[in-house]
Amino acid sequence: MLIQKNQCHITRTRENCDCTMNTVNEDLCLSASTLGSSSVTTQLVDPLDRKICLIRRQNDVKKRVIWGIEVAEKLHWKGWELGKETTRTLVLKNLSLKTQKMKYRPPKTKFFFTIIPQPIFLSPGITLTLPIVFRPLEAKEYTDQLWFEKEEGVFCVTLKATLPCYKLDCPSSLQLPMCALGDTVETWFCLNNVGDLPTFFTWEVPAPFQILPTTGLLEPGLGCKIKVTFEPLIAVIHEVEALCWYGKGNKQKNSINIQAAAKCAQLLVSIKHKGLEDQDQEGFQKVVHFGYVSVGSVAERQIRLYNPSAVNAPFKIEMAEHVLTKDPSFSCSTSQGIVPPGEKKCLSLFFHPKTLDSRAIDYFSIIPSGCATKTLLQVVGFCRGPDAVLQHSCVNFHWVKLGERREQTLWIENQSDCQAHFQFDIDCQESVFSIRPAFGTLAGKTRMTLHCAYQPTHPIISFRRVACLIHHQDPLFLDLIGTCHSDSIKPAILTPQHLTWYRTHLARGLTLYPPDILAAMLKEKKLERDEDGALILPIESLPMQELEDLPDQKYPNIPPMTEYFFDGTRDLAIFPPAVCLEPIDVDFGACPGPEAPNPVPLCLRNYTKGKITVVWTGRSDCPFWVTPVTSDVPPLKSIALRLYFQPSSPNCLYAVELEAFAVYKVLQCYSNIEEDCTVVPSWCLKVRARGHSYSPALEHHIPHYSLDSPQTFPAVSPGKPSYRSLFLVNKGSMLMTFSLAPNSSSDITLRPSSGLIGPGAHQVFLISTYPKGTSWRQHIFYLNFNFYPQYLKEVSMQSREEPLDLKLDTHKSIYFKPTWVGCSSTSNFTFHNPSRLPLQFEWRVSQEHQKVLAVQPSKGTIHPNENLTLTWIFSPLEEIKYLFRVGIWVWEARQSQKTKPQATVHYRIRLVGMGVTGCLSAKPVELDFGNVLVNSQEVKPLVLLNDGNCTLYYRLVLEQHRPKGLHSDPCALEFDHSEGTMPPHSQDTIYLTARPKVRSQYSWTISYCLLSQRAPPTNSMDGKKKALCHVSLAAAYPLLSVLDICSMGSTEGITRKHLWHLFSLDTLNSYLARDPTAKELTYKVPTRHSMSRTPPIFTPLKLDFNFGAAPHNALPSVVLLVLKNCGLVPLDWAFLFPSDQQLDLDLWVEQEDLNSNELHQMRAEDNSLFSINPKTGSLNPGQEQMVEFTYRHLFVGTDRLSVLFKVSHGREILLQFIGVTVKLEQKYVHFTSTIHQFIPVPIGDTLPPRQIYELYNGGSVPVTYEVQVSVLSKVQEKNFDHPIFCCLNPKGDIQPGTTARILWIFSPIEAKTYTVEVPIHIIGWNSAVVCFQGVGYDPCVMGDTAPFHSISSWDSSSISSRLMVPGQNVFLSQSHISLGNIPVQSKCSRLFFLNNISKNETIVFTWKPRSLDFGEVTVSPMEGEVGPEEGAPILVTLKASVHASFYSIDLICKVYQRELMRQYHKELQEWNEEKARQEVEFTITDRKVKRRAYCAAHEPPKKYKTLPPITNQPPLNRPATWNLKLAKKETSWPCPQPPVPGLLCLGLTARAHATDYYLANFFSEFPCHFLYRELPKKKSSKEESKSSEELPDKKGPVSRQKQQLLVDCLTSIIRGLLEDKNFHNAVDQNLVEQVPYFCQFWNEQSARFLAQKSSLYLVPILSLPPSYEGRKSKEQEEDLFGKMPGGQEDDEEEEEDEEEAEEEEEEIEEEMSKDEEDIDKDAKMTWSGIKVTETSQHSLQWQWQQDLKTIIKEETESDEKEAIGRLPAFANLQEAILENMIQNILVEASRGEVVLTSRPRIIALPPVSMHRTDNLLQMSQGDVLCSGMQHPDCLLVSASSPSNMTT
C-alpha cells in the first residue's frame, strides 16, 4: 500500500472524552467527491500521532456529573501483566457551590483495592485524587464497582480490566451523496485499530458499492483511510451492509450500513445566442444554423446544457456515423463531461467546411447517463469560397512595333468575404506577355490592380489565353492579344472580334482552314455569313444524312475546369487542336557541367490545311532555348525541334515555361486578307523545362513549405470528373521547384505538374480525377521538391462515384392506423440521403388513388446527409382495406430546371390502410353533479372513451331539459372544449362546469357528432347526433337545522321541552328550511360592511333566544345547541354580534352621541354578558356541531342583544338574545309566552290524554302557584256542561331552579278550536293570564292526516343526535329515545349503551331516580363502572299508567372518575374516623404554656385539629345547582366534598292511548306491545323522600354474619350436588345427547313424529305427574316473577309471602314424595306390561287402556298449560325471559361476539332407522325430548342475564 502522512485532530467534550478521529486534510476522510476515476490511493494516519491519541485515550476517561460531583464513568486497565500491580487514579471534582460530603465503599473483589475508606469533604472547586490498584492473578477479564454514598443517594464507578484483543473501529453508518446513473461518487472513512494486536482485515460489500483497499494489515494504534465507491445502475435508494472481517481466523466482524441514493440525471439543451433560423423548441429536433462560412475557416456555435436535477449529470456527445463521408465538416470540442447540479455548461460546435458551394448537414446526439433520453441536435452550414472576378476578360494591346513595350492595367476583385489566393499560369520572364503581380492574395471584399505588358520579340500575331488559378474557386481566363509589326513584316491586326468569330468557327469546324481558302469558299458561295458576320456552311448544300451530325452553330459555355484541363495539350480536348507540340514537359535532371546536356527533341505537328509559321519568343539569356527559333510547317506535316539547356551557374535550380506562337503563313501580311472574318488568332505553344546544376555530392537545399491539400474529391455524378485545388506556399528564403513524381497514381491529373516557386510565393494546383465505383478509392501522388529524391511529399486523396441512392425507412412499407371513413390519418415516412450530392425527388401517385392518398411534400430536394420526413395522408372512402404501391423518382439536383436529368432512380413503397367506422362513449353514462349550491360553480370531469380502432374527430352538443319557467335563463352547464380528437383505444377528459341560478333539478343530454375532414368545418360527416351522456344536478341552498338542546349551569332545572320553546327552535328550523331572499344574499358570506354600531338588517326574520332567569351572580346559564347540516351542500355558519359587522374605523369617524339601545348593546358586548363558542363553523352534509351559548348574570334586570345568524349563501335570521337576572331573595316565575297550545285531540275520545304546562322558578326562593279554575267552569257551561279544560293540580309549590308541571286534560266535543284565558297567580308575587288553546278534530274526516299519526308533529325529540360537551369522554349511544304511540298499561323497554372513549380512565356512573305523576320509568343498572374504551349496556323501561297521557322525561346520569371517587371515599372515611375520635376528646387547660409549647415542638404534628362545637343551624333552601357567591363561615375542618360529576341527559318521550283507541288506529302495532297487568304500588312520600336523599354512590358494607351464611348455604348446595347420583346421570345424559338447534322450538306433532323415528333406540321414560309439573312450573314462574323489577312490595307483605311460601313448600314436599312413589309404581307396571306384550296377546287390551289414560292425561295437561298461559304472571315471566334473551344477544353483538347479519347455520342430525312403532314409547319419548330441551336454555338465559346479576 502507498502510505502518506495525514494529520488527525482529536476532539474532546466534557460528556464524552473519547478521542474522535476526524481527518480534515483536504476533506479526504468522511467527505464525498464525485470523481469518476477508479484509481485508489490509501492513506494511513501518521503512526506517531495515532499512538499519542491512543495513550491519551488510555488516560482520558468519559466523565459525568452526579449531584455536583464530576467523576469518571469507569476506569479501564489495558496492557497489564500477571502478578504486577497497576495503579490508576480516580478524580473527584466538586462543581457545585457548597461543600460536598460523601463516603465510599472499597471494591468487593480482592483484585481491585484502594486506601482505607474515610469520609470525604470537598469544598467548591476542589479536586480529590483516589488511587486504585489492580493486581491480576489470572489471564481473564475483571470487573468491579466502587460505590460512593451521599445524602442524595449512591452512585458507582465501574472498574474493568480487559485482555489484549483484536478490535477495529469504524463508523456504524455511512451516507454517500446522491449519484446519477452512470456516474461515480466516492467517500473516505477511517478504519482504526483500537485493539492491542496487529490485525488483518478483509472487506465484503455488495454491488454497486466498492471498497478499496479490500484487504490490509493494521498495526495497533494505526488507522487507514478506506475509500467507498458508488456507481449505481438503477435509480433507487441503495442500502447495503459492508462487512469487515478480522481477528483470528477472520471470525470477528464490523459492519457499516452504507446508504446512497441513485437518481436519473436530466439535461436541458438549449442554443446559446439563438438565431432566426435556429430551432430550439421543446419536444422537437433542435437545429443549429452556422450560416455561410468561408472555406478553410472555422465557425463556432455554442449550446447550453442545464442540469435541473440534484445530482451530477454525466453526458457524452456522439456524432452520427459517416459511412460515406471521410472528412466531416463538423466537430465538437467535448466528447463527454459532467454538468454539476443546478449549473449550466456551454459546449462549442465547430464548422470547418472544405467543399465549395455545398450545404453540410450533420447530427449530434447528447446522451445523458442513465435512463434519460438523448437529445438529437441537427447542425447545418453552408460553405462559401472566394468569388474573384477580373475587370475584363480580354486585354487588347493592338499593334506594336517590334522592340516596343506596351502596358495596360486591369483589376481583380474578391467579391466574397473569403480570402482568395490567385496565380496566373504564365511565365512572365519567358513570354511576350507579362502580368504584375502574377500571384497574390485578396482579402474579402478587396480589389487589386494588375499591370499587363506586351513586349514582342518577332513580328507576329500574339494571342494567349492565360488561366488565373484561384484556390477554392474555378479558374478565371484572361485573353491577351497583340500584333507586332516590323518594317518588313506587317501581319493582320488581331481584334477581340476576331476572337469571337474564331470561337464560332471553332464550334463550326472552320478553324482548320486558312483564311485564303475560307475567302475562296465564301466567294464560291460554299460559305455564308450569319447575322454576327461569322462564316457558316449553307444548310441546303449539306445532304440530309449530315444534318444530324451538324455541329453546334454556337460556341458552347465550357466550364472553366473543363477548359483548363482539356486545352488540347493532353490526350483529351474539347476541340481538335490545330497545332500540337510534344513533349510539353522536359526534365533535364542534373547538369552539373561543364559539358552541356544533350538537347531534347521536340515534335511539332500541323493539323491544319494551311501552312503555318512557328516563332519562339524566349529571352536571349535564358538557359533553355529551342532551335530553330522560326520555322514553317506545311499543312498536315510535322517538324523536329531541339530543346537545349545550358545552366549559367552551378548548384542552382532551373525551371521555365518556353512560349511559341504558330500562325497561318498567309496572315503575316495583312494584304493577303480578303475577308476580315477569316482572320484567325495565333496558337500559343508552351513547353515546361527544368533542370539543376547541383553536383551529385552536394545535398540540395531543404524546402520549407506548407501544403493545403484536401482529403477527398468533391462529389460528382457517375462519369463526371471531380476537381480540387491545392495550395503550396514556399516559406523558405530560396527558390523551390516542384514536380509530379512519375510513380504517382495515373488516374489523377495535376496542373501545373512542375514549376518554380520563389521565396514567399505560392502555387495553386488544380487536380482532377474520374471517380470510379461507389466505394472509396484512394489516390496517392507525390510531389518532388528541389530535384532531390528525399524531398518527396506524399499526398493522399479519396474519391468515389456518388450513387443516386436513398435510404428508406420502415423497410419500404407504410402502415396507416385504422381510419374512420371520412377522416384522414397520417403516417410519417423518413428517408435519408447517404450521398454527397443533393438529390431531387418526386412521388408519383396514380390518378385513381389521389383522392385517397396524398403526400406532403410530393417533390423537393434532399441535401447530403439529411434526414427528411414526409407525411402521408390516408383518407378512406369506404370501409375496406386499401393497398397502394407508390414510386419515388430520384435524380441529381441541378440548378437548371429545364435540363432533363440524365439518370434517374426510382423506388417503390407499399402502403396499407383500412377504413373503419367508430363511435364514442362516455364514462359515466349518467353523470350526477350531486348537490350544488345555487349561484356557485361546480366542475366535474367527463371521460370520453374511444374503444374503436380509429381516431375520431368529434363535436359535442348540449341539450338542456330546463325546469318549467326557466327557459329565459342561460344554460347552466358549459364545456371546457366542445371539439377534439380521440385516438383509438384512448380516453379524453372534458370538464363540465355547472352554474345553477335557481333551486331546481337540472338535467341535460350531451350528444356528439363526428366531424369529417373532407366536409366544411361547420358540417359533420354524420349529421345524426348520438346521445353520449345524461347529466343531472340538484341545485340547493344550504339547509341548517337545530337537532338538540341541552342546558347547564343555572338553566339545569329547565326541561328540554321547555328550553326548546324558549329558544323558538321550531320556528327557527322552519325559517332555515326556506329559500333565502335576494336581500339576504346581499352579502353571501359574513363580512364587515357597516359603519354604524347598529348594522343594517337585510332579513325580515326575527326570533328570540330566551335564556330564562336566574339570581344575581349565579352560575352562568349555558345552553348547548346541536347544529346539523340537513341539506345537500356544505355550508358555513356564523353568529355575528354588532361589533362583528362593523368596520374598523378611526376614532374621529365614530359618532359621539349614543342612544339608549346602543349603550345597552355596548354594555352587553363589553361585559360579555352573552357569548357564543364557537361563533363560526363549517359543516358538511350530515355533519353535526355543538355550539355553546352562555349568559352571565352580572347585572340585575333584563338584558337584550341582537345577534345575526348567518348561513353562507343562505338565510339570515336576526336573533334577540334575552336574559333575566333576578335579585337575591326575590320571587320570579318565568312565563315563556302568554299563549299555550295544547296538542290536538280527536273528538269522541272517552279518555283524552293528559297534557302538561310547565312553569319555571327562576328566583332564589320557593314560590306557590295557583291556577284560577273558576274560568274553566264557564267554558264547561257553554259546552253542554262538558269539561273541555280540566286542571288536575291547580295549586302547588315550585322550588328554586326547578320546573313545575301542571297537568291538564283537554277533551273536545266538536271539531273546532277552543280558547280560554286562565289567570295563574304566584302567591306573594305577580299574576299572569295565559291563553290556553286546543284543537279538536274528527278522525273520521282527517283519516291518516290526523296529527297523532306523526309523532314529530307534537314531539320534537324524535331525533338521533349525540350531544357531547367539549372535553367529555363519556356519552350515551342515544341521547333521546322516542317510544312513539303506545297503549296504556304497556311496558316498553329500550337498550342503549354508555360508552367511555377515554383510553386510561375508568368511570363510575349512577342514574338519578325519577318519579312520575303517572306511570313508572326504571333504568337498569342504576349504577356501575365502565372501563377505558368500553361500553355498558343500559336498559330503560317505561310502564304506562291506565290513563292516556303524554310522557316527556329527562333522566339524569351522573358520571364520576373512579380514581376521584376512591380518593373522596378515602378522605370521607378518614374524616368520619377523626370526627368520632374528636367527639370523645376533651381539653384540659394547662397554665404552663411555655413548657407545653416547648414539648409540643418535639411532638409529631397531627393531621387534623379538633372541631368547634356543633350547633344546629337551619340550612338555606337553595338549589344544589347554583353556586352563589355568598359569604360562608369558614370551618376549621371542612368535610370532604364529592367530585363534580359529569351529567348525561336521556330524553324519553311517548304518547299513551287508550286500548280501544289504540286498537282502532294502530291495530297492526298492538301485538308489538306487552301489557303489564299488575301495576306497582305507589310508594309513600316518606319513602320517596328517603330514596331521593340517598346518595347512589354510597354502598353499605356487608356484615360478617351475612357473608358466613352465604358461604354455608353455597357449601351445602355444592356438596349435595356432588353426592347426588341423579344429578351426575342427568349431566352425563345431557353431555352425550346432541340436541339440534331447531328441536328447541317444540310442538306436539313434531314430538310425536320424532318419537316414531327414534322408538327403536330410546327407552320408555314416563313423564312426571301433571300435578308435580304444574306445581313446579308455577313455582318457577313465581320465583322468576318475584325477581322482576316490577315485583317490589312493602316489608310487611314480603314477610307474609315468606311465611306462605314456607307452608307451600312443606305441602309440595309431601306431595312430591307421594308422586315419586306413584312414579315408581307406574314404571314397574310399564316394564311388566312390555314383557307381557312380547309373550302374550292377552295384554293388548291392557295396553289400550293405558293408551287411553295417556291421551286423557295429555288433554288435561294441555288444558292446564292453556290456562297457565292466560295468567298475567306467566305472561310477565315470558316477557322477562324474551327480554333477557334479546338483551343478551344485543350485548354480545355490541361486543363483537355475535354477528347478527351473518347467515344462520343449522346442523341437523342424520336420520335414525326405526324398527318399533310403539305409541306409548313415541309419546313418552316426545315428552322426554321436550322436557330435556327447554329447561336448560331457559336457565342459561336467566343465568347469563346481566340485569339479574345487577338487581
Swiss-Prot record:
Topology in the lipid bilayer: Single-pass membrane protein; Single-pass type I membrane protein
Organism domain of life: Eukaryota
Keyword list, A-Z: Cell membrane, Cell projection, Cilium, Cilium biogenesis/degradation, Coiled coil, Cytoplasm, Cytoplasmic vesicle, Flagellum, Membrane, Transmembrane, Transmembrane helix
Disruption phenotype: Deficient male are infertile whereas female mutants could give birth. Deficient male show severe morphological abnormalities of the sperm flagella. The majority of spermatozoa display absent or short flagella and the flagellar axoneme is completely disorganised.
Coiled-coil regions listed: 1457-1483
Family as reported in the entry's similarity comment: Belongs to the CFAP65 family.
Function: Plays a role in flagellar formation and sperm motility.
Protein's recorded name: Cilia- and flagella-associated protein 65
Originating gene: Cfap65
